[in-house]
Swiss-Prot record:
The keyword S-adenosyl-L-methionine does not apply. This is Probable DNA ligase. HAMAP family: DNA_ligase (MF_00407). ATP binds at residues 210, 217, 232, 261, 296, 367, 373. One of its GO terms (molecular function) is metal ion binding. DNA ligase that seals nicks in double-stranded DNA during DNA replication, DNA recombination and DNA repair. Keywords: ATP-binding, Cell cycle, Cell division, DNA damage, DNA recombination, DNA repair, DNA replication, Ligase, Magnesium, Metal-binding, Nucleotide-binding. It comes from Saccharopolyspora erythraea (strain ATCC 11635 / DSM 40517 / JCM 4748 / NBRC 13426 / NCIMB 8594 / NRRL 2338). It catalyses: ATP + (deoxyribonucleotide)n-3'-hydroxyl + 5'-phospho-(deoxyribonucleotide)m = (deoxyribonucleotide)n+m + AMP + diphosphate. Its cofactor is Mg(2+). Its EC number is 6.5.1.1. Belongs to the ATP-dependent DNA ligase family.
Length: 510
């Protein structure tokens, strides 16, 4: 029976080292000690997650509690997991008070170090998508299986606890039992940025060059008349998008899984602001604003899984059933032809193009170099770490953003700069309210946040700097928009920031 203190100690060891090898060894050592019923919750806690999602406890409740700490550790992983499940099940009149009482009882049994860990775990402050890669390597080491087998199972399940349970219980045989399941979302394949269109074309040869639309990523699953639609973070939005459900039901197939984008268009066919598209996914979504789907991949068709087939074959399947809803694209090895569609995409109001090798398999959940994205300016998706109170016209608003890049070795986000450029009055008002809901602590001028909000930043380039721990700083950064469709695990890494060069037209060589 493993104690929570063992998880806390291991988590501290992982946070204290920059060595990926040491992180993997520490986590694998603890995973190998967990009993069968402890593997799921133990894996989740180590990753800074809760198995069933949020427990319905906010920072206001957590910060109001201050019970005396226990002198010696006694809480087990199983007891904490059961208490969190109980918190989640509380509802009805007086639920807030009952949650506070249950939480106070739990914290009273915890040592000071365990209390700090539990508060950060329940508040979402420990969630680090960057730790996923380290966790997967540790699961493989603890179970004595190939890392590729663990990664593939995770791609298909989308859940670290389930992947760890399968690996430690049944090894590669049980991991091999994970399949693409229609109705269960899988993690989307991601693209790496290319500096220029010529660079991408030279690397990949014959490619599909597609519009990179200014929309939201969707994954569509259909089995008969049963349709489910998910965002890039695997959140189900089916009930919010009835027009997409109706369209997918009309496709000439029995079962299908499609990857694509959706967006709202104005009367001239140009994309409406991204926030309007994302507004359709909320509880108060404006149903009179119709969404249009544009699909670019087919992962399953009528009982056949297509993930491991080359893109050219998946596009053939897509053409069979959804030709009228394909994203604008050309298949070519000619740079001049590709440059034409790049210009067309920009003229139509979109972000740029995607360049994809026709030989590429679908690497779910991974950011590979067989898919490249090309834009006319540098942009990065970064995590908001904190914000400073403004001065003058911005007085009373949280304004200057502290921006962090993802640590590929599983550490906390690495600060790379600050900016208040590009913030409209509307955004200032929104983030001042939103940031205080996500606050972890504050000092005289700065409010620090749970590192989970992603913001898209445009910049001229980066420069070497000793001011920030990553050794680089953003140049002339400005806010383009917040990305509610992305989580911190989708943010750009510090390596991606370092690779950014100075301004140049993305379609040009050199």
């Amino acid at each position: 029976m493993v104690l929570l203190s063992d998880v806390v100690r291991t988590s501290a060891e992982v946070s204290a080292t920059r060595s990926r090898k040491s992180k993997v060894a520490a986590i694998a050592g603890l995973l190998s000690r967990l009993g069968e019923a402890e593997v799921g919750p133990g894996t989740a806690f180590l990753a800074g997650e809760l198995r069933g999602g949020r427990a319905g406890v906010g920072w206001a409740t957590l910060s109001a509690l201050d019970p005396a700490a226990a002198g010696e550790p006694s809480l087990t992983v199983a007891e904490v997991d059961a208490a969190i499940d109980a918190l989640r099940e509380i509802g009805g009149a007086g639920s807030g008070q009952r949650r506070a009482e249950l939480l106070a009882d739990l914290l009273a049994r915890a040592t000071a170090a365990e209390q700090e860990f539990l508060v950060r775990l329940l508040g979402g402050e420990l969630r680090q998508g960057a730790l996923e890669g380290v966790m997967l390597e540790a699961i493989a080491a603890a179970a004595g299986v190939r890392p590729d087998a663990v990664r593939r199972a995770f791609m298909l399940s989308g859940r670290l606890p389930a992947t760890a349970e399968a690996a430690l219980r049944g090894g590669e045989e049980e991991l091999g039992g994970f399949r693409l399941e229609v109705g269960r979302p899988l993690r989307p394949m991601l693209a790496s940025p290319a500096e220029t269109l010529d660079e991408a074309m030279t690397e990949l040869g014959e490619v599909s060059v597609e519009y990179k639309m200014d929309g939201a990523r969707i994954q569509v699953h259909r089995d008969g008349d049963d349709v489910h639609i998910y965002t890039r973070t695997l959140r189900e939005i089916t009930r919010h998008v009835p027009e997409l459900v109706e369209l997918v039901r009309g496709l000439d197939c029995r079962s299908i899984v499609l990857d694509g984008e959706t967006l709202a268009l104005d009367d001239s066919g140009r994309p409406r602001p991204f926030q309007e598209t994302m507004g359709r996914f909320g509880a108060q979504s404006p149903r009179d604003l119709l969404l249009h789907p544009y699909f670019f991949d087919c992962l399953h068709l009528d009982g056949r899984d297509l993930l491991d087939l080359p893109l050219r074959d998946r596009l053939t399947a897509l053409e069979e059933v959804a030709a009228d809803h394909r994203i604008p694209a050309v298949l070519t090895a000619d740079a001049e032809h590709a440059s034409g569609i790049f210009d067309d995409a920009l003229e139509a109001g979109h972000e740029g193009v995607m360049v994809k090798s026709l030989d590429s398999a679908y690497a779910a959940g991974r950011r590979g170099r067989t898919w490249r994205k090309v834009k006319p300016s540098h942009t990065l998706d970064l995590v908001v770490l904190a914000a400073e109170w403004g001065h003058g016209r911005r007085s009373g608003y949280l304004s200057n953003l502290h921006l962090g890049a993802r640590d590929p070795d599983g550490g906390p986000p690495i600060m790379v700069g600050k900016t208040f450029k590009g913030l409209t009055d509307e955004l200032l008002a929104w983030q001042t309210e939103e940031f205080q809901r996500r606050e972890t602590h504050r000092d005289d001028w700065t409010v620090h946040l749970v590192p989970e909000l992603v913001v898209e930043i445009e910049l001229d380039g980066v420069q070497t700097s000793t001011r920030y721990p990553g050794g680089v700083a953003l140049r002339f950064a400005r806010v383009l928009r917040y990305r509610p469709d992305k989580d911190a695990a989708s943010a750009d890494t510090i390596d991606a920031v370092r690779e950014v060069r100075g301004p140049q037209r993305a379609a040009e060589g050199g």
